[in-house]
């Protein structure tokens, strides 16, 4: 494969994400564009390969012991940061402590809350002690926020854009672009083929699709399903689809009235015509969601929970029981996902038949992720999903994660859910583990604040001038957001 790959050239990527409020801090990265930037200049301890398999990135070998409570990670030797510093255990420990710190605003803080101690085994070995065993621990360390940064004087500089990755960051303009040149010292000779890379934010779907059709960029993500057949007619363009765990949600915050009311949440969950959304918004490029962020692509998916259907009578019953009257605001933008505004309007129309009045408020695309999502009571969102239930729950649903965008805390069900997530992680009997994850999904499905109507395929378009390996990762868009590292010009 890489034997035939051409070296050189300038790659230009167009992302439908990015905001003027973005920063280079990996801990606050919240969209595909900044993730693409971090993965161009940096490396993680582990990552999902394009085969779907979890492999060591900066880790050469690892071993769990003591009931998966103790983990020893042996780092690759001779890996250099772009400033010439050799990677060692201090860099790993200091980076992770930056995310774990008391005042940390990192989205990965909750993921790492199970770590009780990190220490140096040797210059190239890091030892982790967990408060309870977790057989999935290496998966958590592949979270895209955990780009390893160089330590200096016991600290890291999260805004430096300094890493060990295939490209050296030259410039970054938030919500506009990042530019890179090849790292001649990259530790993987079979990756990082381009001389230069440019990653652009192109929020407008039509402009983004035109950019790849006109040859201004080489690849774009988030192709609108409505345009797939038109773009396929272009002889110079390939459409690439991957099916994974990406899903679209409408999170209701339990810390904001009226969403603190169980019956109101249930009324809204029953007011959604999911199949209509899959048909009209995804045009079939996806599958039904059932208000749980776990699907058949993941282990321990609870397929015994009946598919939640549109039920106007039950929706009206729960709405009346909630005691609510008046309009319910739903703040959305197509920044969340292509067709989010249309999806919200379809939900408003189907809810009206149950006597529920939803006011769809269209928000600006720029700043949506910092001003609306995780702040307003009800909005639209997308998640790339995660390969295991443990990781997905810790990313968005446990009490201590910054990204618990439904603020699902404090209810009896949420307390039980948090207990189950901790217990399931350290459970070595897979049948018992399955029972715990199944119950956790039932609690979330019933009491949680998420409306998750659909799982969406990743759809990207690229020029036929680009070549790639037979497998393309489905854990994120753009080949796991490592297109710049893995692809080459044919």
Q: Where do the model's predicted regions map?
A:
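Ligand-site clamp/hinge motif
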Residues: 185-230, 349, 357
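Detector for C-terminal structural segments
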Residues: 173, 272-300, 336-348, 369-490
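Surface-exposed binding/hinge segments that line
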Residues: 74, 108-151
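Short, low-complexity disordered leader/linker segments with a strong preference
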Residues: 1-9, 101, 117, 309, ...
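Gly/Pro-rich hinge or "lid" segments in bacterial periplasmic/extracellular proteins
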Residues: 49-53, 142-192, 196, 313, ...
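N-terminal lobe/hinge region of extracytoplasmic solute-binding protein
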Residues: 14-66, 97, 162-163
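Aromatic- and charge-enriched surface segment that lines or borders ligand/interaction sites
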Residues: 60-105, 121, 127, 211, ...
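Alpha-helical secondary-structure segments
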Residues: 12, 87-97, 123-129, 165-166, ...
């Amino acid at each position: 494969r890489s034997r035939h790959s051409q070296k050189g050239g300038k790659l230009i990527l167009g992302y439908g994400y990015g905001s003027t409020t973005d920063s280079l801090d990996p801990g606050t990265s919240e969209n595909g564009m900044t993730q693409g930037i971090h993965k161009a200049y940096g490396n993680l301890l582990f990552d999902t390969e394009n085969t779907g398999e979890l492999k060591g990135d900066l880790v050469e070998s690892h071993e769990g012991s003591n009931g998966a409570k103790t983990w020893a990670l042996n780092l690759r030797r001779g890996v250099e940061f772009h400033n010439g510093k050799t990677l060692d255990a201090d860099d790993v420990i200091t980076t992770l402590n930056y995310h774990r710190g008391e005042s940390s605003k990192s989205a990965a803080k909750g993921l790492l809350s199970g770590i009780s101690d990190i220490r140096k085994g040797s210059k190239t070995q890091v030892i982790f002690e967990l408060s309870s065993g977790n057989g999935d621990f290496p998966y958590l360390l592949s979270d895209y926020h955990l780009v390893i940064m160089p330590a200096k004087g016991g600290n890291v500089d999260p805004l430096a854009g300094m890493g060990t990755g295939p490209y050296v960051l030259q410039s970054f303009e938030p919500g506009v672009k990042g530019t890179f040149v090849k790292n001649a010292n990259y530790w993987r000779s079979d990756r990082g083929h381009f001389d230069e890379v440019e990653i652009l934010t192109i929020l407008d779907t039509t402009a983004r699709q035109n950019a790849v059709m006109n040859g201004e960029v080489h690849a774009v993500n988030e192709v609108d399903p409505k345009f797939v057949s038109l773009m396929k007619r272009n002889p110079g363009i390939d459409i690439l689809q991957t099916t994974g765990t990406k899903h679209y949600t409408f999170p209701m915050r339990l810390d904001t009235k009226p969403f603190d009311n169980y019956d109101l949440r249930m009324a809204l969950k029953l007011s959604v015509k999911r199949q209509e959304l899959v048909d009209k918004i995804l045009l079939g490029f996806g599958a039904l969601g059932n208000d749980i962020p776990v699907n058949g692509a993941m282990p321990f998916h609870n397929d015994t929970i009946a598919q939640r259907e549109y039920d106007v009578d039950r929706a009206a019953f729960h709405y009346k029981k909630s005691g609510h009257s008046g309009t319910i605001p739903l703040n959305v933008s197509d920044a969340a996902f292509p067709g989010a505004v249309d999806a919200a309007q379809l939900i408003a129309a189907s809810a009206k038949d149950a006597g529920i009045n939803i006011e769809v408020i269209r928000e600006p695309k720029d700043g949506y992720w910092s001003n609306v999502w995780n702040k307003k009571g009800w909005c639209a969102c997308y998640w790339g999903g995660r390969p295991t239930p443990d990781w997905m729950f810790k990313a968005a649903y446990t009490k201590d994660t910054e990204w618990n965008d439904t603020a699902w805390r404090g209810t009896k069900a949420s307390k039980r859910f948090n207990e189950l997530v901790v217990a399931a992680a350290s459970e070595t009997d897979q049948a018992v583990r399955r029972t715990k994850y199944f119950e956790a999904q039932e609690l979330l499905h019933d009491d949680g604040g998420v409306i998750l109507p659909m799982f969406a395929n990743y759809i990207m378009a690229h020029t036929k001038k680009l070549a790639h390996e037979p497998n393309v990762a489905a854990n994120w868009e753009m080949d796991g957001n490592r297109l710049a590292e893995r692809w080459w010009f044919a």
